[in-house]
UniProtKB/Swiss-Prot annotation:
It comes from the Bacteria. Belongs to the CinA family. InterPro entries: CinA, CinA-like_C, CinA_C, CinA_KH, Competence-induced_CinA, MoaB/Mog-like_dom_sf, MoaB/Mog_dom. Coiled coil: none annotated. Gene3D superfamilies: 3.30.70.2860, CinA-like, MoaB/Mog-like domain. SUPFAM superfamilies: CinA-like, Molybdenum cofactor biosynthesis proteins. This is CinA-like protein. It comes from Trichormus variabilis (strain ATCC 29413 / PCC 7937) (Anabaena variabilis).
Length: 416
């Protein structure tokens, strides 16, 4: 017994609209413990919709459709489903009355095209839409097969799912077990290297462990099936602890943790402060830090020293070093960190200087070369050299630079 999500809409295929409905429904199915192995996006074409249904019924017992329930000619979901299963469409007086009242409440008269939304397969139950004019259906066209249809408007679909579909599914016995997941996050290690370290855990039956790469980071999704979230967490906890022990400092957080939030909590707990000096990241590091509510407890501010005159004038970088070594060098990175730490009187300081591209690289200093400075209590200062590669774009290099700077400080705070 499993479910399949089928999202109908050419606008989804063209990328005009982000398919948030599939994400929402996938999360909801997990909360009900309903297995879910496939999602499909298909355009507003009856033949292709039928092809998708043909495949879906061979591997799933619950089909959940979103989109294609409107009044226009290209809204074909309901009639195509009915045609596939050989069922006639019947007009629902209840739906006609509901649509008529909604138009009247808005001071309008229902258009003839809206009558199309009242056509449902014979024998289907209405899935009421409290806010819009597009109702859905719950239909069992054959034994051991249930079909749900929802409008594509997310707010309407969410409410209809919660108020009608969830009670129906729970009445069918679903929801007695849930699928609960925790996302373990890692920085400073590649996906393949991490997978090799935790290979013994990748074939566990319950909880399951699966690696996937994010934007510069790696995640392990640990999922358990259990009667409750508490029971699932009890299954996950020992596996999570063992993986953390194996990964060491490469592990940095779970679920919605970010490097900025983790660093922030470490600084807050120690009563210490941070400032930043940025060149190639242009304020991105400061933005990451200030996205965290309450970051003013530990983040004093920063200097965007894009031009060398600012590096020298505001941060006290030696002009001779700038001329001789260039702005992208370990010496300049260290002086930037010392300068902003001194100027803002903070415990710690981070600096970033590099070549984000796509222009500006040379044979000796290619695009992707970045130096990160870290200044700490007393006279502590050091720098780190990274080459993030010439094949990555400007945005990604800046992102890697800012996150790596946060990770360096995180590791320093944890190992002092």
């Amino acid at each position: 017994m499993s479910a399949e999500i089928i999202c109908v809409g050419t606008e989804l295929l063209l990328g005009d609209i982000l398919n948030g409905n599939a994400q929402y429904l996938a999360q909801q199915l997990a909360q009900l413990g309903i297995p879910h192995y496939h999602q499909t996006v298909v355009g507003d074409n009856p033949d292709r919709i039928k092809q998708v249904i043909e495949i879906a019924i061979s591997r799933a017992n619950i089909l959940i459709f979103t989109g294609g329930l409107g009044p226009t000619p290209d809204d074909l979901t309901c009639e195509t489903i009915a045609d596939f299963f050989g069922s006639p469409l019947v007009e629902s007086p209840e739906i006609i009355e509901d649509i008529t009242q909604k138009f009247a409440q808005r001071g309008r008269v229902m258009t003839p095209s809206n009558r199309k939304q009242a056509l449902i397969p014979q024998g289907a139950d209405i899935l009421p839409n409290p806010t819009g004019t597009a109702p859905g259906i719950i239909w069992e066209p054959r034994p051991d097969m249930t079909i749900f249809t929802f409008p594509g408007v997310p707010s309407e679909m969410h409410r209809m799912w919660q108020e009608t579909a969830v009670p129906f599914l729970k009445n069918q016995g679903w929801g007695q077990e849930i699928i609960y997941s925790r996302s373990l996050k890692f920085w400073g290690i590649g996906e393949s290297a991490l997978a090799e370290k935790v290979t013994a855990y990748l074939n566990l039956p319950n909880p399951t462990v699966a690696p996937y790469a994010g934007k510069g980071e790696v995640r392990l999704r640990v999922s358990a099936k259990a009667p409750s979230e508490v029971a699932a967490e009890a299954l996950i906890a020992p596996v999570e602890k063992q993986i953390k022990d194996i990964a060491g400092l490469d592990f940095y957080g779970v679920n919605h943790d970010s490097l900025a939030s983790v660093v922030g909590e470490l600084l807050r707990s120690s009563g210490e402060t941070l400032s930043v000096a940025e060149s190639c990241t242009g304020g991105l590091l400061g933005q990451m830090l200030t996205e965290i509510s309450g970051s003013s407890d530990y983040f004093w501010g920063g200097v965007i020293s894009y031009d060398n005159s600012v590096k020298a004038g505001l941060l006290g970088v030696n002009p001779e070093d700038l001329d001789k070594l260039g702005a992208v060098s370990d010496t300049v990175a260290e002086q930037m960190a010392i300068g902003v730490k001194t100027r803002l009187s903070t415990t710690w300081a981070l600096s970033i200087t590099g070549i984000a591209g796509p222009n500006g690289g040379t044979e000796t200093k290619p695009v992707g070369l970045v130096y990160i400075g870290l200044a700490g209590p007393g006279d502590e200062v050091t720098s780190f050299k990274y080459n993030f590669g010439t094949m990555r774009d400007r945005s990604f290099i800046r992102h890697l630079s800012a996150c790596t700077a946060l990770d360096l400080l995180r590791r320093r705070l944890l190992t002092r």
